[in-house]
Amino acid sequence: MKRLLILFTALLFLLAALPALAAPAQLTWYGHAAFKVVTPNGKVLLVDPWISNPSNPNAEKDLAALTKVDLIFLTHGHGDHIGDAVEIAKKTGAKLVATFDLQKAMVAYKGFPAKQAERAETGSFGGTISLLDGEVTVLFVPAIHGASMDTPNGPVYAGEPGGFLISVKNGPRIYHTGDTDLFSDMALLKGQVDLMLLCIGDKFTMGPVRAAQAVDMIRPKKAIPMHFGTFPALSGTPEEFKKALRRYGLEFLMYQMKVGETLTWK
């Protein structure tokens, strides 16, 4: 009996010494191009955090709930992608991940805290950076779009538009296209993407047909449409996107998130 007690006690100490099992990564869509990624270790990333966009009925509640954010990613300097970034950064201390020129413009023209926009979190297209002690790796990729930043004195240069391939340790590889048209170098990401978050709204970005062609080039595990329906001009629809995917036999790849939905990656 005494021997069993000793073995049981030793087992308890061993279990206590083991690291806690990490939770699965999660992806939340706030509408438009705004997403939250939670890593298995609980780090919080926001991409193009316009939480208060018109398609989000719970914007006020969602903003209030963002009390812990580690990194804010911005694809370019347009207002519908900067969104609530400055407010969230000031509240949470989140650091800005963006190209060098966009970082500087955010500090100079939008009041983003300079101490939270440092060289460790910046790069340029083709460059890769490791963040959060290796928990997140980021590849900066180009996009085809405008990228000026609005100020009281008119638009200013804020770097070139882009996207991100965000690789989460023990989690998904997420390609956020930013605002873009289809371009041939997308094919270089083939086989490297689990979740593709891609614009389908048309007029200012690729529409459903060209977005489907982008999916055919990359072949992600899931294709999640975004940047549609926020304004009347963004007329592309998920239904049209799915129809266009059907031409390639890829309609099964589409996953349509609802605003406020959280997808768990297993």
From Swiss-Prot:
One Gene Ontology term of the molecular function aspect: hydrolase activity
Keyword Metal-binding in record: no
Database matches in InterPro entries: Metallo-B-lactamas, RibonucZ/Hydroxyglut_hydro, UPF0173, UPF0173_UPF0282_UlaG_hydrolase
CDD domains, alphabetized: metallo-hydrolase-like_MBL-fold
Highest taxon, organism lineage: Bacteria
Keywords attached to this entry: Hydrolase
Hydrolase found in the keyword field: yes
Family to which this protein belongs: Belongs to the UPF0173 family.
NCBIfam families per record: PRK00685.1 (NF001911)
PANTHER family with a match to the protein in the record: UPF0173 METAL-DEPENDENT HYDROLASE MJ1163, UPF0173 METAL-DEPENDENT HYDROLASE MJ1163-RELATED
The protein's name in its UniProt record: UPF0173 metal-dependent hydrolase Glov_0171
Organism field: Trichlorobacter lovleyi (strain ATCC BAA-1151 / DSM 17278 / SZ) (Geobacter lovleyi)
